[in-house]
Structures are given as structure tokens and as C-alpha cells.
Swiss-Prot record:
Gene Ontology BP terms: bacterial-type flagellum assembly; regulation of translation
Keywords on record: Bacterial flagellum biogenesis, Chaperone, Cytoplasm, Translation regulation
UniProt protein name: Flagellar assembly factor FliW
GO CC entries: cytoplasm
Amino acid sequence: MEIKTKAMGLVEIQDEQIIELVDGFYGFEEFHKYALLDSGKEPFFWVQSLDDQNLAFIVIDPFLFRPDYELDIDDELLKPIEAESPKDLLVFALVTIPPAGSPITANLQGPLIINKKNKKAFQAVLNDGKWNTKHDILAELNAAGRN
């Protein structure tokens, strides 16, 4: 299947790349179907809306720069995506790329959680106070000795 994307024009995708956000992203609740695309620039991925080519998010695996990242998610929140085990889950942090000179940040307070088995997903909100919406990715990589 071909889709139009914001960043890469026309792209061929496979069914396995399609995810369904059961409630949409916060602020974009009306959009539910997305494709998870390789950005071509590791370690980032695109989450591209299938309904609006101008709606796309950059995401990253938060464990790459915060190996101590922990999610305390209530089992009730996992029911809509039918997750049976933590092993079934993929976790991504949404990335913000600001104007030049400002750090690239990741939202660790509102991660994207995907059930690998059925491709259902949701955006969680972590309220433990440890994580915030603007973690400096480069500073965190340097602190973790991974850059």
C-alpha cells in the first residue's frame, strides 16, 4: 500500500507497519490509523497518520538514552490494546525538534505504547513526577555514555 507522507513523499508500507491508536494522540483524538516508518536517520522513526499526510510525529526508543526509564502503567489502561505481558509492548517517546540552537527533546511523560501482537496502541500519561515532557536527548545520551 502507498501512503503520502509529510517528510518523505509517497512511501510504500506493509500491513505490519500500521498501528491503531485506540484514542488517538492527545490533541489529535480524531486520528487513529498511523504507520510506523523508518526515518532513515537512526535512532528515530516517523509515526505518520494515514488519514492526514501533514500529521506525523518523530519518535525514539527511550531506553536508548534512559536505560533507567520505568513505566508504571495500570493494567486497566492496557486492556484496550489487549496486552497480556510487558514483552508484548513497544515503547516510544515523542520527539520535539526545536529551532536551531535548542536541544532536541523527548517526551517521557507521555510515551506511545504499542502492542506488538495486534498493533493497537495508546499514548500514556505518567504521573509519577520523575519524567517530564522535555528530556534533552543528547545530554541524556552523553550521561549514559552512549554518544
